[in-house]
Amino acid sequence: MLQLLLAVFIGGGTGSVARWLLSMRFNPLHQAIPLGTLTANLIGAFIIGMGFAWFSRMTNIDPVWKVLITTGFCGGLTTFSTFSAEVVFLLQEGRFGWTLLNVFVNLLGSFAMTALAFWLFSASTAH
């Protein structure tokens, strides 16, 4: 149990630092859409899709790696709370079109990245 807790802790910290770095780098590039949050969510969605595909086929993988990558790293990297706050800020500024675009791209983009990664990894390990 302690190993699992440490894996979540290490993965979560690493994912959170990665999200912060992405926000610092990409959020200033566009005033209306926080590109750092979008990038973090899309990357996290891809990684978790790849992870689930990999873990479903490689059943002998240590559970520590599973929680390090999924619950830890992806949990720290992706963020629904920041996304929600940014949507509210856009609404408060009256940027309704940008709000809808931001919600659409974050949600559908994340679903698409998870499905793409799962499909790519499943196809590559089917042989």
UniProtKB/Swiss-Prot annotation:
GO terms for cellular component: plasma membrane. Na(+) binds at residues 75, 78. The chain crosses the membrane at residues 4-24, 35-55, 71-91, 103-123. It catalyses: fluoride(in) = fluoride(out). It is found in: Cell inner membrane. One of its GO terms (biological process) is cellular detoxification of fluoride. Na(+) is not transported, but it plays an essential structural role and its presence is essential for fluoride channel function. Fluoride-specific ion channel. Important for reducing fluoride concentration in the cell, thus reducing its toxicity. HAMAP family: FluC. Belongs to the fluoride channel Fluc/FEX (TC 1.A.43) family. This is Fluoride-specific ion channel FluC.
